[in-house]
Amino acid sequence: MSRIGKRPVELPGGVEASVSGQTVEVKGPKGTRSFKATDDVTVSVDGNVISVEPRGKSKRARQQWGMSRTMVQNLVTGVTDGFKKELEITGVGYRAQMQGNVLKLSLGYSHDVDFTVPEGVTVTCPKNTEVIIEGNDQQLVGQVAANIREWRAPEPYKGKGIRYKGEYIFRKEGKKK
């Protein structure tokens, strides 16, 4: 029995959920999100509670049970609080700034890197060494943060690059003479 899957998902005030077939749609103050569950699980809404049940006893049904419940929980969290990733830029001359819908990154290359922000995500730069990514889709927010970090991942000798806020960078000692 799935310890995660058997717990129902509570709907906070101001959030509505509907199920049509295998598609769960959640509406809240931060927008609307939907998720298509696999045929191995049954999703139902009872008042302000969403419950997910497996359709059989197969291993795949039990695997999908916990995953589907977590996906529904992420829909509810996304439309109420949203998701947020913070990046820190470390290095001499490394900086970021927003220009309309484009994040302009100076990362020590011979040219600036222009990153176009996709729909459904907002990117802000409170300081030129900080980038904040927010949205109601956890997967999209994380993917955008990973794509930005990929341009200059932190290196282990000086720690220069783009890192997640609070991320520990394993440091190495340089060569000895």
From Swiss-Prot:
PANTHER family in alphabetical order: 60S/50S RIBOSOMAL PROTEIN L6/L9, LARGE RIBOSOMAL SUBUNIT PROTEIN UL6M
Domain of life: Bacteria
GO molecular function, one term: rRNA binding
Keyword RNA-binding: yes
GO CC annotations on file: cytosolic large ribosomal subunit
Database matches in NCBIfam families: L6_bact (TIGR03654)
Stated role: This protein binds to the 23S rRNA, and is important in its secondary structure. It is located near the subunit interface in the base of the L7/L12 stalk, and near the tRNA binding site of the peptidyltransferase center.
Quaternary organization: Part of the 50S ribosomal subunit.
Alphabetized UniProt keyword annotations: Ribonucleoprotein, Ribosomal protein, RNA-binding, rRNA-binding
Gene name linked to the record: rplF
Protein name as catalogued: Large ribosomal subunit protein uL6
Similarity-based family: Belongs to the universal ribosomal protein uL6 family.
GO biological process: cytoplasmic translation
